[in-house]
Structures are given as structure tokens and as C-alpha cells.
Amino acid sequence: RYPDLRVFESDFLRMSPDAVAPGAIAVIGNFPYNISTQIVFKVLEHRDRFTELVGMFQKEVADRLCAPPGSRTYGISSVLAQAWYTMEPLFIVEPTAFIPPPKVRSAVIRMRRNEVTSLACDERVFTALVKAAFNHRRKTLTNALRGFPGLPVVPPKFAALRAERLSVADYVELAQACGPP
């Protein structure tokens, strides 16, 4: 029925996308909760190959990935995932769906790669900037990014804000304000 469908059973963190198939790859899985964030970061690293991911995650991880700016759960993984993928929470899976039931709730989400696969800034600077801002999430960006390479002064419109208040577009704008890496 699905002549183009190929199923690979392997250690996702060790496999090379090139060894799986040429071209676009969609990932579907019930990921081990202890490595699910690493799986997402591998997808982000190879975003030119991974067009979509549908997976079950611990609910807290799914909430973080899908969180909007300004929410308590918005963080590094939210910004980086949303920079290249559209995040869609699909449904929650209660512990009673499993035998034995886990102590945590689960959620299934879909990540669809955006049409624009590159940002309007240096992506290494963007990633480093997001990580630096959230490493001091309770500080204003002026203090959190003090000494960040290429950014002598945080632009005034961001200076008094905290990391969780900025959208992906805001982080792109901040990265553009930085000099070359």
C-alpha cells in the first residue's frame, strides 16, 4: 500500500540520516523519555533532512517544545525547535494507557519543518545567543548577555526584557545586531 515507506529500527542517536535514505525523512516514534530532548536536538542538527517528526514525549518536554513566548515553560528547546519547525500538540496520553502505568503524563506532538529553512542571521550566533540568554533566565537581557561576543550593547527595545519574553524573530534580530562570530 505504501511503496515509498521504509521502516528503520535503530538507535536514533547513533544513526546517520545519510545511511537511512537520500532526501527527506519523517520520524515517527515513542521516544525513550530520558533521551527525547537529545533526539529533538539531533533532528534540529539535521533539519535539512528531517521534514517532520511525530512523537510521544513526556508531557513536560512536549509542553516546553510547544511553549509560546512569555510562558513559564518557554526555553532554549522552545526557541530552537520553533526557529525551524512548526510545533503542534496533538493529544495527551494518560498514565492509565500503559501497563504498568508510568508516574508521568505523555503527549504526542508534531514538528513540521518550516518552508524557510535558514534564518536571516548567523545560525551559530543565534544558537549561542539563545543559550546565553536562558542560562540566566531571571536576569534582564542587558545582564544575561553582558560580555556576549559581538554584542557590546543589547538594543534598547530588548534591554529590560528577560529571555522568555522574546520570540524567535526577536532572537534573530538580536543575532543580527551581533558582529560576525
Give residue ranges: language-model regions.
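Alpha-helix C-terminal capping segments
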Residues: R1, V20-A21, L145, P152-P156
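Short, locally clustered residues in the helix-turn-helix/winged-helix DNA-binding domain
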Residues: L44, R146, G179
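Short hydrophobic "helix-edge" motifs at membrane interfaces and signal-peptide entry regions
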Residues: D48-R49, P155-A159
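Short secondary-structure junctions and interdomain/linker hinges
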Residues: R72, R137-T140, P181
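An accessory alpha-helical subdomain
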Residues: A97, S106-R113, S118-L151, F158, ...
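Catalytic cores of RNA-modifying enzymes
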Residues: R1-L129, E173-Q176
